[in-house]
Amino acid sequence: MSKKRTAAVFLALLMWGLVSQASAQEAEPKFNSNGDDIMRIRSLLDEFRQDIIRKEGYALTKLVLNPDVLFHHTNTQEEIDSARKYDAQFDGIGPSQLDGFAKLLATSKDKLEERFRNIEIRQDGPLGLVTFNYDFVINDKVHHSGLEVWQVCKIDEQWKILSVAWTIY
């Protein structure tokens, strides 16, 4: 291949790389967010965490939009199949576990804590998405871990939890 042809191919590949990189950057989602709201969402996570440590189930329920929010771990296929032996329409989620969790906090004699890692917060106006890895710790030992996903919304100038879903390992 001649030097001119090699240079032309190199230039074409370079230009193609720049164009595809620019396209990829434009394809990234844009968010209408601000630092104050991100900070307030992070404070919501901290309040949630502190309510677990202090075992304040009632206080934790005030962080959610209403008592009917989705608050549930994702079931394995084995758990779904087992539940369908008694309920053919079981959807894999079931009723919210918020009340049960609040009661656990209020009545447990164990030391409880939820630790968050790799927190990512995305906010667009009055809607936010929070993802993180967690460890649920009982008496200073990790009981289970997983990924937790929250949807949050801003209403009456306050950030509230709209849904919480998590995996368990």
Q: Language-model features: where?
A:
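A mature extracytoplasmic/lumenal domain signature
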Residues: 64-67, 75-76, 120, 132-136, ...
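Surface-exposed, charged secondary-structure patches
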Residues: 84-139
